[in-house]
Amino acid sequence: MAYTEEQIENIKTRILTALEEVIDPELGIDIVNLGLIYAIRFDGDTGDTEIDMTLTTMGCPLADLLTDQIYDAMTDVPEVTNVEVKLVWYPAWTVEKMSRYARIALGIK
């Protein structure tokens, strides 16, 4: 099914909402508010979805766990038929990418 641009934006918003359920177990904050999600691409014709994300450090041992949780979270968005999570390292993650909520929750000014 082909979606309008408005419908695609709505679906991407629901994808982000679903991703807010994926919590970094070390920090206790979701990956969206941590600023780990860099891009979401949703193909309105196929339902294929690509998510570009990073980690707080290159050697983060939670990559597989977070990726698995992302796949699980996408089951809440029925329009998403296939998901590919791409780990990206540029631009590098910094605390400035965190939302105000995340910085307050972690005591960072």
Task: Write out the residue ranges for each language-model feature.
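Domain-level signature for proteins that mediate thiol-based redox and metal-cofactor handling
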Residues: 1-109
